[in-house]
Amino acid sequence: MRTLLYILFACFWICSVPAGVRAGDHKAEKEKKLSVDGPYVFHLPDGGLRVIAVNKERKLTDTVYAEVPENLLLTVIPHKYGHPFQVRLQKPERQPWNMMPAEKILVLSDPHGDFHSFISILRAQKVIDEEYNWSFGKNQLVVIGDVFDRGEDVTAIFWLLYKLQQEALAAGGRSLFLLGNHEEMELRGNVRYAKDKYKNLADTLKVKYKD
């Protein structure tokens, strides 16, 4: 009887190991799933444009244009909080290195991918309206770094700042962004504070996250 119990225990242990491995593999596969992100815009050497994004259905879209379309509108979808918004792609321009201060200057730092908190502060200070449009007139918004890391909406915040830069300039104001230490870390490839969603997308595209 004791021998039979040993045999049954051994069989149970042997059978349970593959099941455990499969469960671990399933967990790893689940963690590798893409989540809403982007768009990422690449100016190609031949003058074309590549736009990569992940939509709400977690579907990856990868669009290549032979040349940069005029007035191209990009849709940005926050990860969880907030509503989608559109951004018009502009030609890259070098910004002035100095400027006169405005009557009002709002200085922020360290949004760290937290879109909900970021827009809540901007709304409370009358910098944007409910639709994320610039409402700060001729005043200035200055974000002194650390948009990267920790949160799920790094790209959404960057695109919102890009949008506000255009709208502020049209209104006679300014929206400015300065690099922080977390931007410098990411550009060097130090991704220990980045959320897995960004690393998963980079792995899917077979590129390094810093690129």
Walk through the language-model features, giving the residues of each.
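Bacterial Sec-dependent N-terminal signal peptides
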Residues: M1-D25
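Feature recognizes metal-dependent phosphohydrolase scaffolds
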Residues: G20-D211
